[in-house]
Amino acid sequence: MAELLQGWKRTHYCAEPTVDEVGKEMVLMGWAGTWRNLGSLIFIGLRDRTGTMQVTFNESELPKEVFEKAETIRSEYVIAVKGVLARRDEKMVNRNMKTGELELIAKELKILGVSETPPFYIDDNVNAAEQLRLKYRYLDLRRPCMQANMLMRSKITRIAHEYFAEQGFIEIETPTLCKSTPEGARDYLVPSRVQPGKFYALPQSPQIFKQLLMLSGFDRYMQIARCYRDEDLRADRQPEFTQIDLEMSFVEQDDVMNVQEGFIKRLMKETLDVDIQLPLPRITWQEAMDRYGSDKPDTRFGLEFVNVSDIVKDCGFGAFADAVKGGGSVRCINVEGGVEHFTRKQIDAFGDLVKTYRAKGLAWLSMKPEGIQCSFAKFLTEDQIKAILERANAKTGDILFFVADAKDTVVYQALGALRLELGRRLGLMDDTKFNFLWVIEFPQFEWSEEDGRYYAMHHPFTSPMDEDLDLLDTDQGKVRAKAYDIVLNGNEIGGGSIRIHSPEVQEKMFEKLGFTKEEAWERFGFLMGAFKYGTPPHGGLAYGLDRLAMLITRASSIRDVIAFPKVQTASCLMSGCPNVVEQAQLEELHIETVADKE
């Protein structure tokens, strides 16, 4: 039966005692991890969130009832031990433990909670399937690596609170029951009981409210915000997620970015003791696409694109010439020394990879010692091949991979995916490197072939660049935005923009997105109405806290830095949500489900 504390107070966490405290009496509390019964000696690895301390029960030095109680301890029992800190014998020292030189010689024991045999071993090297670990998440979270992840996440939020408070930011909470303004991802809806037929939406971001706070005179806002998006899940996405959300008034783009760079520098120093050099590099969206095929490029390695469109535009190879004539491009990657690394079978596999990104195929040119081997050599002149090799700085031993298409988006996506695959296979993604950069000057709009209309690339409140305002009426697709993303090792960790603060420009923006004036006012009237009462220039940024924590902890999945995550069906395997609710609850909310009718 579980015992009560009855006045016992923990004096130390398990990994806190030091050699300077040898001989001191202390009380430790935690979970029994490893345990060994050697007859007259029992060794328990007592674990809490700080680490593990070996506790030794010596039969010859303990009352009979204490030792017999110790004999009943099994894995994951919750115990409290009163004892004296001692040095281990030299031959018993464990150099792999922070407390490996120490042990607690037990004098008294309380068993505070008993445990059934866990469904998997509570250890970092556990082989249990993730589904099982998520079902018993409260046990999975006891593993040292998971505890370390949660502690690091907590440290990140603490640093954010401290840094932005020092910079004059005010923490303000925004509503989680909001108006549905469908544009982009689907909303999670909450039915109103008191207003039948009406619904709240859970916020996809605090965007509108933080802009309204700027209108309200709070010139620097910060919040650790919970956000919700009803979208198909990927490895790095969850239906509910957390943002470090920020907004500033009376600023331009550089002002926002400079404040964020200070945060990044401090964050990396205090979490990983990594010194980040400022200012961070900046490249435009177009440059990022042209060089890396991605708006969140991994710059830890090269393998940059080489545009050879002008060289091959009139060549005899139809795949190349047609791509250029169709308004697209031909680009290649030069893999230095690639001849030694890749077999023909592997090259064929690369061809299959680019086809998954709608490329028609992969062309290649191999600079072997005995001469050039090329999948398209007979269609090009010697001068054209020579020009390609010179532009790509190719030499003997190198191999070039080409993708051509009449749509640059296909070339970017296909060759960009190949670049990342090559980086992985060649071991170029150094986990000890932290390459931050800003991507700026995004397109204001992106065209949807499926819907036949433009959408806002970021959101409809992003300000166009001043010099592009006239293009809104003449060439909408060429308008650039005052938008900026911060990227780390190929991952977008934050994004923001300078916002529109002119009512006229905001109305024009909605018009260009296909909203009638009535539709815009129906959805966003409370914001547009507020714009009439004096709006300061403002802008901001939001970091994805989950993704940031994943990268800093080097976790393999975003689920490993969230205490109770969902799986790809947006379900919680531990609690069983979402679940069917009682009919009475539905009736009270004036809801009838389609499944009921069927």
Predicted region positions:
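Class II aminoacyl-tRNA synthetase catalytic cores and aaRS-like
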Residues: M1-E598
